[in-house]
Amino acid sequence: MAKAAVRKPKKKVCVFCKDKVHYIDYKDTSLLRKFISDRGKIRARRVTGNCSQHQRDVATAVKNSREMALLPYTSTAR
């Protein structure tokens, strides 16, 4: 019996490269919330589709935003 053909998932495109965004602002919490899980963790590159440079920028912006108390460190209590 032959194996079924396995489709490769389509590669996600970096949102920031597509829109030519040069600076990710830590005060833009509505944008940054898209890159945070419901538990408050920063989502991985393979999940969000960001390139490596913009993933680093997002992580830095999220950390700065948490430090300024604009975003929570965790979202749910255990």
UniProtKB/Swiss-Prot annotation:
Keywords: Ribonucleoprotein, Ribosomal protein, RNA-binding, rRNA-binding. It holds the Pfam family Ribosomal_S18. GO terms for molecular function: small ribosomal subunit rRNA binding; structural constituent of ribosome. It comes from the Bacteria. GO terms for biological process: translation. InterPro entries: Ribosomal_bS18, Ribosomal_bS18_CS, Ribosomal_bS18_sf. SUPFAM superfamilies: Ribosomal protein S18. One of its GO terms (cellular component) is cytosolic small ribosomal subunit. NCBIfam families: S18. Belongs to the bacterial ribosomal protein bS18 family. Binds as a heterodimer with protein bS6 to the central domain of the 16S rRNA, where it helps stabilize the platform of the 30S subunit. Part of the 30S ribosomal subunit. Forms a tight heterodimer with protein bS6. This is Small ribosomal subunit protein bS18. The lineage of its organism: Bacteria, Bacillati, Actinomycetota, Actinomycetes, Frankiales.
